[in-house]
Amino acid sequence: MNDKSSKAAASEKAKALAAALSQIEKQFGKGSIMRYGDNEVEHDIQVVSTGSLGLDIALGVGGLPRGRVIEIYGPESSGKTTLTLQVIAEMQKIGGTCAFVDAEHALDVQYAAKLGVNLTDLLISQPDTGEQALEITDALVRSGSVDLIVIDSVAALVPKAEIEGEMGDSLPGLQARLMSQALRKLTATIKRTNCMVIFINQIRMKIGVMFGNPETTTGGNALKFYSSVRLDIRRIGSIKKGEEVVGNETRVKVVKNKVSPPFKQAEFDIMYGAGISREGEIIDLGVQAGVVDKSGAWYSYSGTRIGQGKDNVREYLKEHPELAVEIENKVRENQGIVSRAATFPASEAEAEDDGQA
């Protein structure tokens, strides 16, 4: 008897739940609530490469996650904008639409083109106020047709009241409130439309800090909480060719990561006018993973010598990009992360459609 009554109660509960789910879907639309075990739910995180193999590995999932808020911060001239332009180039390669909200009014389009950004398809906005920048971002996210938005930078998102006020006016907390309100509004839409939003941020010093780290980022604490990934990028040295400085040695630390264990770091070279030296990373990480063999100054792959000295091998891989991708994907496989060709599920279907057409 007890068994029958418990079954009946369970059946009633199941019916009540089904009715509630149906009502929610009717009111808020299909997909507003679902069982995690259902096929419609995506278990795998869609990612986009950062343009750096080492950083993709450090992130643990093979790149930056889509449908999330990302914060990239660091001192001046550390490579923040370069890194975001590389991400834009990678997103465009796989068919994504990208927007650059240039609040600093300092985007160098020639440099962006050198990094592989397709300027013809890039959406660029240079807003007058912080409110305007965030309203434009909100409109682009809600459209559902933009895959990546970069905001450069949080420090330049000046509230309208500050612009219209006098130079010496004290308006404490205004920018922090603006960011907090915008992120509350944006987060749910970002997830639903699978759009990645990257905020570039600057570093400030906290006055009077005796112990601990005196560094902080601008725009209050909201961005720290809403970000799924926070990257701290620093210049750690210079790359010289003779006496001439031709690039920077850069270190990126994954300070926060909601999609994989945090606190990993990656080091790579940023060459002036060329961006992240991907080939250099492929060589170093290929040797570490045992994919590329190094004997003295000679480097070999699959029993074939590919060059003597790192610079020669780098040039060889630039001339043979298909070999570079092959080695990179073997390194990714070795690390258990998604290969470059598979970072965007829609691209395969699009490729098939192109083939049929």
Swiss-Prot record:
The keyword DNA-binding applies. GO terms for molecular function: ATP binding; ATP hydrolysis activity; ATP-dependent DNA damage sensor activity; damaged DNA binding; single-stranded DNA binding. GO terms for biological process: DNA recombination; DNA repair; SOS response. Pfam families: RecA (PF00154), RecA_C (PF21096). Its main location: cytoplasm. It comes from the Bacteria. CDD domains: RecA. ATP binds at G74, P75, E76, S77, S78, G79, K80, T81. The keyword Transmembrane does not apply. Keywords: ATP-binding, Cytoplasm, DNA damage, DNA recombination, DNA repair, DNA-binding, Nucleotide-binding, SOS response. It is found in: Cytoplasm. One of its GO terms (cellular component) is cytosol. InterPro entries: AAA+_ATPase (IPR003593), DNA_recomb/repair_RecA (IPR013765), DNA_recomb/repair_RecA_CS (IPR020584), P-loop_NTPase (IPR027417), RecA-like_C (IPR049261), RecA-like_N (IPR049428), RecA_ATP-bd (IPR020588), RecA_C_sf (IPR023400). Belongs to the RecA family. Can catalyze the hydrolysis of ATP in the presence of single-stranded DNA, the ATP-dependent uptake of single-stranded DNA by duplex DNA, and the ATP-dependent hybridization of homologous single-stranded DNAs. It interacts with LexA causing its activation and leading to its autocatalytic cleavage. PANTHER family: MITOCHONDRIAL DNA REPAIR PROTEIN RECA HOMOLOG-RELATED, RECA. This is Protein RecA. It comes from Bordetella petrii (strain ATCC BAA-461 / DSM 12804 / CCUG 43448).
